Amino acid sequence: MTGLAGRTALVTGTAHGIGAAIADMLETEGATVHRVDKDTLDVTDGRAVETYVSRVGGVDVLVNNAGGVCGQTGRPLEEVSEDDWRTVVDANLTSTFLCTRAVTPGMKERGWGRIVNISSGAGRSVSLTGIQAYASAKAGQIGLTRQTAHELGPFGITVNCIAPGFVLSNPTTQRQWESYGEDGQAALVGGIAVRRLGAPEDIANGVRFFVAEASSWVTGQTLSIDGGHAIF
């Protein structure tokens, strides 16, 4: 398929899993894809992000996928340090703001743009991780999606969001899954309408919908892709 032929895309958090699947999908759609991860670009550093986008020469499609729990585990609120909080919020929410800010001038100039933020079911309900900063940052991404969609819509730019359910996509989610044990795993799958965990390609397919020309009248939305978990 060549629906994005001639377009340039930037995807953050592409080392594996969801980000890699999204980048692969965009390439099959004909886009020139720039893949970045923490080893190639610090997306919490505004100057570095601006420099990277300038060097790329313009971004038509931005997928803010970078983030995660940053090696943290759920702890009582009183045991969470300010540094712990900032690390997770910066990785998930601040990075989304910085990357969006960097690509906006070029999108405005060209009169076209697609921005998709990868949030989480943790941004819409209680997080399975138990990490307060993660739940807060993911909810913040949803709010940022609405606000920027309202601001950028007149310039031909749509901004949407995906809230994935439990996707086995990286070593962290694999460890989390294994920690549940057989009973916990059965309970989790039993709470998913289609009775299976998500795959990275499920999320990539949601991004495919949002970046398509046919979705030009869809903006400010958050799509839960969770196998029906949110309906329980």
Regions inferred by a protein language model and the residue ranges of each:
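Short C-terminal tail/terminal secondary-structure segment
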Residues: S125, V207-R208, T219-F232
